[in-house]
Every structure is written in structure tokens, then in C-alpha cells.
């Protein structure tokens, strides 16, 4: 650790660590921040740069199972304003360890195909996005694997449901 950094550690009443935060010489969060549940199990790890979330963030359930993982990226505009957005893949899991959802972000906007799953592992939704809005055919499956609905979106606006016997593979999708 740099001699110009300070570490602040907070504890729960039972003596377990609650959080560990590093600060730079300007008093802003810098590096890895870790939070724990009162039980002592790790709750979250997030990286900071000059007080702003930057890089990998991981959350866990109190049981120790991974809950969520994403990345943050910091941007600065021409006026010097700083923004932090999700950037890259975001994944969530059920406490059982089964994947719950997965999507991708580009400068804070969801893009491409977002998927959600039932805890059984069966896909629940496939949702196409283009620059943060729904665009293309959104498909919903039942837990048994049967397609329940197909809705067409264009630039974020619903254009209606497709007939259930229609093959969505032939419908135009997000590119």
C-alpha cells in the first residue's frame, strides 16, 4: 500500500468486519473496497479509482454463492465531466449457482441479446437490444420449454405479437 493512502475498517457489533475501504491522498476511495455480511461472509468487492467505481464488481449471497458480476468504466467528456457506466458483460446467478441473467453493456446502455433463465436452467426470455432499447423479436418460454410469446419491437416500441406458430428465426433481428 502507498504511504499516501489510508485504510478504513468498520466492524459489526459482533466483531466481524463490515467494510474495508482504501482512500487516496485526496480522501477519495482508491483500489479494492470489500464489504461483509454481519455473519462474516463476503458481500461485495468493487474497485475504485479516485472515488469512482471502476472495473470489476462482484456480489455474493450470504451463503457464499456468487450473486452478480459486472464491470464499470469511467468516461470523461470534453467539458471534464466524469461519468461511470456499466460496460461489458453483466451476469447474475440464483443462490443455487444456476445462471439467472446475462447481458452486455456499452457505455451504460444494454446492447445485443439479453437472456434470463429459470432456476431450473431453462431459458425464460431472449430480449434483443440496440443502443439501450428493445429492438427485434423478444421471446418468452415457459418453464417446460414451450414458447409462450414472441413480441416484435422496433426502436423500443412494441409492434405487436407474432403468431405462436411463426418461426422467429426468419424474422429480422438486431444486428
Language-model features: locations:
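Glycine/tyrosine- and acidic-biased, solvent-exposed loop/turn segments at the edges of beta-strands
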Residues: 1-175
